[in-house]
Regions:
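Outer-membrane beta-barrel proteins, especially TonB-dependent receptors
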Residues: 1-348
């Protein structure tokens, strides 16, 4: 499970070849969370959570100051190049940070031949703005991430006999290997991910805080294949739009006794998945709408060298699914499901 600047990444992650749609070059702090603390992040988090966050904004500058950095890289294998840059400024109670990233690469190669159609192209922009008062801190975060990655031509095997022949030969047929290129043709995948987040932190007193977070994500994924009709190859076989709306409330407290801390929160998520028509293929993931609500409690204490944590969480999920089973018989299905789950974790 990945958390990008406090927002749970929601994308079409059902494929083993689906890389997370986020710009790691824009994260200044990376943390791995395990144990009872994972209880706050809901389903899919019990194995651990990776937190990617920006550094704090430069508040409290008496004069306007501008800082920045640029990073440039080159990949000899794919003749790929990459660049990223950050610029930030702050003045009194206000802070602003802008970040951008671009990468482009061509065909990868082994020692003996080129792996055609394995190029990649990625571009990302993000902005973080904030205001900090005595008791309140408000931040706005937005990002857009786009990537296109080619799929190796020879990886498409039609049957077992063809696979065995490929193993026996030990390499692709030399007549099918083409010169190096940056061009990406079907089969390939492309995706676009948009994130918007608003957060308000309220300091009730030095030991008690309230956090309110509202976020929206839009994930568009398209997958293209080589089809029998060439003109259809540029029509995606999968064309999915996933939208996620989320609202979280968190109360945090510190206690003097045994260095105890308490976190209690509520989370609400509404999500829709829509398959755009015209792909001429059955949808791999059906259309659905899901409403999830949950509440959790996390308490930690220290007894000398011994650290203990107790976490409890209850989740409720409503799911409505509909679609067609195939293009041949157009069998329509419509289903409605209710799920609930209670989780408790104790760690020392």
């Amino acid at each position: 499970l990945l958390m990008n600047n406090g927002v749970r990444l929601e994308s079409q992650s059902w494929g083993a070849d689906h890389a997370p749609e986020l710009d790691y070059t824009g994260s200044s702090m990376v943390e791995v969370v395990k144990g009872a603390e994972c209880i706050r992040y809901g389903f899919g988090a019990m194995g651990g959570v990776v937190l990617l966050n920006d550094a704090p904004l430069p508040y409290e500058n008496k004069k306007i100051k501008v800082n920045g950095n640029v990073n440039i890289g080159y990949d000899t294998n794919a003749r790929g190049f990459s660049g990223s840059g950050t610029i930030e400024t702050g003045y009194k109670q206000f802070g602003l940070r802008l970040h951008g990233m671009y990468t482009k690469g061509g065909d990868y190669h082994t020692a003996d031949y080129v792996l055609n159609n394995t190029g990649y192209n990625t571009i990302s922009f993000s902005a973080l703005a904030g205001w900090q008062g005595k008791k309140l801190t408000a931040t706005l975060f937005s990002s857009i991430y786009y990537q296109r990655s080619g799929i190796y031509y020879a990886s498409k095997i039609s049957d077992l006999s063809q696979l065995i022949k490929r193993f026996e030969y030990g390499r692709p047929d030399p007549e099918t290997v083409k010169p190096f290129s940056y061009e990406i043709k079907p089969p390939f995948q492309q995706s676009q991910h948009v994130t918007l987040k608003g957060e308000l932190k309220w300091e009730l007193n030095p030991n008690h805080h309230l956090n309110f977070t509202l976020s929206f994500q839009e994930n568009l994924r398209q997958e293209f294949e080589n089809r029998k009709k060439t003109q259809w190859s540029w029509i995606p076989v999968q064309d999915l739009m996933l939208k996620t709306y989320k609202f979280d409330v968190l109360w945090q407290a510190k206690w003097k006794l045994w260095k105890m801390t308490t976190d209690a929160g509520l989370s609400n998520t509404y999500q829709t998945n829509f398959n755009y028509p015209g792909t001429k293929q059955p949808a791999f993931v059906p259309n659905f709408a899901a409403l999830s609500m949950g509440g959790y409690f996390l308490h930690k204490a220290e007894f000398g060298r011994l650290q203990c944590a107790l976490g409890m969480r209850y989740d409720f999920r409503v799911l409505s699914v509909n679609g067609y089973s195939s293009l041949s018989n157009y069998t329509y299905y419509d289903d409605f499901k209710l799920y609930s789950n209670f989780t408790m974790s104790l760690a020392t």
